[in-house]
Amino acid sequence: NCCLTGVLTCRWINSQHFPLSNLYESLLFLAWALTLIHLILEKLIPTNENIIGILFSPLPLLVSAFATFSLPEQMQTMSPLIPALKSNWLMMHVSIMMLSYAALLAGSLLSIVFLIVAKFKKEPISFESNTVNSLTYMLDQLSYRTLGVGFPLLTLGILSGAVWANEAWGSYWSWDPKETWALI
């Protein structure tokens, strides 16, 4: 996470704007957010289970590798912002959206692992017992809490995007494909 923080900080200093103006910077920020969520979840685990590290360690690496090796060079270069992006709403809207994507991705991954572990352990999925320290219970609680953070962040991100659109183009909603899919 320190290396990603350093890269994002250097791009911020060199470009004179928050590094979320293109796909490359957004993917690096997503990798940073995934690492942050990984570190937070590691602190929340009451046991010495290493499953969170096993699950989350490859994600930022894969996102960073995709951003670095798959995107064309012109998408990785810094460029001046267009006038519509020269707003403080850029930093708020895009960073909140990327944090929500990271939280929703993490929660979904935890839910998938919960289903896999519950199937292979062949234990009934019942949360009325006193087995609070079981792996399935821990995965369920972490996925629930992570998704519970992701959805409000997504809502806040969509609302801040609407306010930003009103400031930039004079309309909160324009039925743009990106906006329509955000609504869906």
Residue ranges and their predicted role:
Residues 1-184:
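Polytopic transmembrane helical bundles with strong interfacial aromatic enrichment
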